[in-house]
Amino acid sequence: MFKNISRILSVVALLSLVLAACAPAATATTAPAAPVTQAPVAPATSAPATVAATTAPVATTGAAPAAAGGWCSNVKIVFFPGGTPGGGFEQVVYNGAVQAAKDTGANVQYVWSDWDPAKMTTQFQQAAATKPDGIAIMGHPGDTAFDPLIDAAEGQGIIVTSMNTQVPLAQAKYAANGFGYAGAILYNAGYALGQEAVKESGLKAGDKAFLWGLKAQAGRGERTKGVQDALEKAGLKVIYQEIDDATNANASAGVPVFTGIMSAHPEIKMVITDHGNLTGTIQTFLQAAGKKPGDIFAAGFDISGNAVTAIQGGWLQLVIDQQQYLQGYFGVLQICLTKVYHFGGLQIDTGAGFVNKSNLDALVPLIKAQER
């Protein structure tokens, strides 16, 4: 299915070029941020680490396979999937990028960052030093840390675009140069999940919810803030815990933190995990805390194979779907469109809606293929 979509996107891009030759130049605009309301539904090396498989990553010394002689075949891209090879969320981002590379012929190299903002900025500098045509980043470090580095890269003629987490000041500054965004609008997505979780759980004012997130991260923390605002507006009492570095890189490291919170607050009725890999580990967390399916209303971000199992088993009740495959696909495509056709940056909101037990079945084959 996604191969067909990608071919269509390439054709649309070519048609757009032809139409552009016959029409006045248009000014790039960004889509208005709106809450997700429809319910259909983070080790690096000193040099870019590259991977060639589409579902089971294996380290290689070259870029992922690309279409020989494709329309973007002379374009060199460094791509940041975010976390670690094989991670439930970032592997799907990677698969989308690999498919885009195959469809366009782009020469793409992949850099894994353990979801560590400091590592991302260091790796960005290393990537820029190789003078690629473009770099597709995860925006977790935020404008303050990233913008001076982006300024330097743009000054060298390197196209930069972001995925998953916006870098809004840099995006506004360099939109005409191809700086786009593919991902959810973070605060709105967080607020929407919090609001939907309250609705589906039936919790009332005064009930306690445990929110495990990344509020301290510039930019990325907006999603956690959105969740908290929605819960507090509904009158829930929020017990908040920042995700530590070890758990951010490896979700299973968070078991002692989770059990400690649940032991200290046995009256908790809801858990929301603002991290795809933590959401996929919710069954492990709850079992370690001595809970049974349905004892706690659990919600979180990002559908994955583990999340599917947790939903089917009654451990996880609600997930907001970022459609992260598209984040990877459009990250590569944006740079190709800008380099080859001089298109400006596109803003693409991939946060489509919610997944729960009622609508899961249709997505299961795609999730198992790591395309959703």
Regions found by a protein language model. Give the residues of each.
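A residue-level marker of the well-folded mature domains of exported/periplasmic proteins
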Residues: 23-372
